[in-house]
Amino acid sequence: MSLVLRSLLDDGLVRETEHDPGGPHYGAVYYEADPEAAVVLGVDFGSRVVRTALCDLAGGVRAREEIRSRGSVEQRIDALASSVRSLLRTSKLPGDLLENAVVALPAVVSPADGRVSSADLPGLGASDLREQLERALRVPVTLENDVNLAAVAEQRRGIAHDVADFAFLLVGAGLGAAVMLDWKLHRGHNGNAGELDAVRSGRSDDVDPCSASVSQFAADLAARKETKLEPPFDVQEIFAAAGARDAVGLAVVEEAARRIALHVLPLAATLDLPLVVLGGSVGANPALLEPVRRWLAEWLPFPAPRVEVSALGEAAVIEGALAAGVDAALERVFQRRAQRRAS
């Protein structure tokens, strides 16, 4: 056994495994990276639902949970800490293996100092948010914009796999975009790149593709036209009605597509991207694809980008948080190993 392999084994970073069917059999001993050398926590800190998941260093998800909470940020953090304990019990992994956490926020996160601003949830912009989370979770915490993490996941495991340049447009309770250029997130100088909510601020509702505005548009149409749709005009029910050829449902989907295309338009015109991925509770509906593509083809004087729906659906944000967490955990694990070897 080489000294390098022995040191990795002593550090718990590799483990003995079964023989390779394609390799030699006589006296050979096989090793693999130990995915349980550490585990990471991913959190999608949404405005309505908080999603949590644990995964090992190989990216294997060991446990998941959803928390539906409308309480204060402090109450949500308490619920999050309780969820992590539940995840550890479910996964049967010891808590001391938890290496770090990545928390996705519906907010701008400064790339310089991690400061949170433009948050959809009151209290999320507290200056000590990361410290609150680290006290509750007892591990280092990284804060990141939720749409940025969705784009990371989509590039690694989704429809944008092996695509160097693309945009991810998340349309749900809020609106935001993430832009990947040459395989890297383009954050902007202050982390504000893709904050499309600021673009629609102060403008009329007929450019707003978010869930509340889409539901209100359905309610207005339902007051004048026959439909099977009923209050509160849930977005998913609207898309289901459109699939059943309900006239109001079809009209709402067409209008939602027009509004989404209005926000894809500047991305396509200024960045000349080959791909735009739609996600979120509104955006991730396949019924939007044909009308969005049609509107873009009509408006753009040059070929429109390919428009696709996220392959990961509502899991895109949490998957991105886990991917970022694994990257950070591997770096921390090997840094500690190097420090031990140097001392």
Regions found by a protein language model. Give the residues of each.
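Short glycine-rich anion-binding loops that position phosphate/pyrophosphate groups of nucleotides
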Residues: 20, 106-109, 172-174, 282-283
